[in-house]
């Protein structure tokens, strides 16, 4: 029962999908980050469904864009927007953290979101769906969430409140780190074997950037920064997928 509750906690927090409601406690939150990558499977499955449906190309590209937003409810985009505002302020660390707590959406957040979706839509329109590409993209969506969960358990926290702090303090960090590190390694090897190592490289590059920006600009990670990482990793991996197809690798 605790196993199923752990999955439900992950889906309740990081997706908009309806799941049974449980009282969150130490037991069912301990390994919630280990279940986080399962949401990537759902996103990938729906992405593949959109790929096989007889849709016009523009409609298919739009569907590819909307799938992750529909599944997650935009929780990661919210973090991306808030972090974009904070980084664009060029204020000190305290100022940036204050902006992250502000519920209002600033001008830079709107600009960055518009640019993000233009780039995402363009890349979705450039990707040719094949079963192999669909499998690689699904694995990539799982990988980015495995890396995000690993970061919550391994990277320093910027503050002692908020979403990242809640899950980090509730987690069995050593077990979570080992599990997600092993899962990430397996996914990276699988992607490389399928000829899409570029997607794995893009995810790792985004993780490296995430760590150094979080540490330098904010003193550690927050829930908003986790969303910022996830959206950037997804865009970079999508670009890698498109480039792999243009180069004839996939």
Q: Locations of the language-model features?
A:
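Membrane-proximal soluble regions of multi-pass membrane proteins
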Residues: 1-24
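N-terminal beta-alpha supersecondary unit
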Residues: 9-12, 26-51, 165-169
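C-terminal ends of transmembrane helices
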Residues: 18-23, 75, 95, 149-159, ...
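Multi-pass membrane catalytic core of lipid/isoprenoid biosynthesis enzymes
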Residues: 29-46, 86-132, 136-137, 174-190, ...
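Membrane-embedded alpha-helical segments that form the functional core of polytopic membrane enzymes
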Residues: 34-83, 134-139, 196-216
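Acidic (Asp/Glu-rich) catalytic motifs at the cytosolic membrane interface
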Residues: 67-105, 214-233
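Function-critical hydrophobic alpha-helical transmembrane segments in multi-pass membrane proteins
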Residues: 133-151
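Solvent-exposed interhelical
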Residues: 146-180, 217-222
């Amino acid at each position: 029962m605790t196993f199923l509750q752990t999955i439900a906690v992950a889906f309740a927090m990081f997706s908009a999908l309806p799941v049974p409601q449980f009282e969150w406690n130490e037991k069912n939150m301990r390994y919630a980050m280990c279940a986080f990558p399962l949401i990537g499977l759902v996103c990938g499955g729906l992405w593949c469904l959109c790929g096989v449906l007889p849709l016009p190309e523009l409609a298919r590209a739009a569907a590819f864009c909307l799938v992750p937003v529909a599944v997650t409810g935009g929780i990661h985009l919210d973090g991306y927007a808030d972090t974009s505002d904070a980084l664009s302020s060029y204020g000190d660390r305290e100022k940036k953290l204050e902006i992250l707590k502000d519920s209002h959406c600033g001008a830079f957040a709107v600009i960055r979101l518009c640019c993000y979706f233009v780039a995402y839509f363009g890349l979705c329109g450039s990707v040719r769906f094949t079963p192999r590409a669909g499998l690689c993209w699904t694995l990539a969506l799982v990988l980015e969430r495995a890396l995000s969960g690993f970061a919550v358990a391994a990277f320093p926290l910027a503050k002692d409140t908020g979403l990242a702090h809640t899950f980090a303090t509730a987690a069995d960090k050593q077990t979570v780190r080992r599990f997600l590190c092993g899962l990430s390694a397996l996914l990276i090897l699988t992607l490389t074997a399928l000829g899409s190592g570029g997607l794995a490289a893009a995810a790792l590059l985004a993780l490296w950037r995430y760590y150094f920006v979080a540490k330098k600009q904010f003193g550690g990670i927050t829930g908003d920064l986790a969303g910022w990482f996830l959206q950037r990793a997804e865009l970079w991996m999508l670009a890698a997928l498109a480039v792999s197809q243009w180069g004839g690798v996939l």
